[in-house]
């Protein structure tokens, strides 16, 4: 797993942002904010992961000018649409369905619930100079 003090890898990946299909480019978030919180989850609609993302939503993390938030799941863009809409998520939901982003952060699960090459549950916080300031798997 990527650790505190490491340099975070950049990525561009398909995402749902404000109800629209988009590409999330990490470098844009890093340039525009003091910190970026990446919330990795193996799949959408997993009760534990949904509770975590709902807590972030309810805490208003996305309302801070100095912090960007993005969720990353191992599901398709279509699942990300349904998930973001169902739970009214105000931050981007990235579809890391091939596990490339998770792999670059050394967060790829060998297997989970019969699936492979999907993200493990984790939170990674990156500052504006690309340094990982917090990293934890759950």
Residue ranges, per PLM feature:
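Chalcogenol-based redox active-site neighborhoods
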Residues: 1-138
């Amino acid at each position: 797993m990527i650790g505190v003090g490491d340099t975070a890898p950049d990525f561009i990946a398909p995402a749902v942002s404000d109800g629209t299909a988009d590409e999330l480019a990490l470098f844009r978030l890093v340039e525009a904010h003091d910190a970026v919180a990446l919330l990795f989850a193996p799949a959408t609609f997993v009760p534990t992961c949904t509770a975590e993302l709902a807590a972030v939503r309810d805490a208003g993390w996305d309302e801070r000018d100095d912090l960007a938030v993005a969720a990353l799941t191992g599901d398709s863009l279509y699942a990300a649409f349904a998930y973001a809409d169902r739970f009214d998520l105000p931050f981007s939901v990235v579809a890391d369905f091939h596990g490339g982003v998770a792999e670059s952060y050394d967060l790829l699960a060998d297997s989970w619930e019969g699936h492979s090459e999907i993200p493990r549950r984790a939170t990674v916080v990156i500052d504006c100079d690309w340094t990982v300031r917090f990293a934890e798997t759950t």
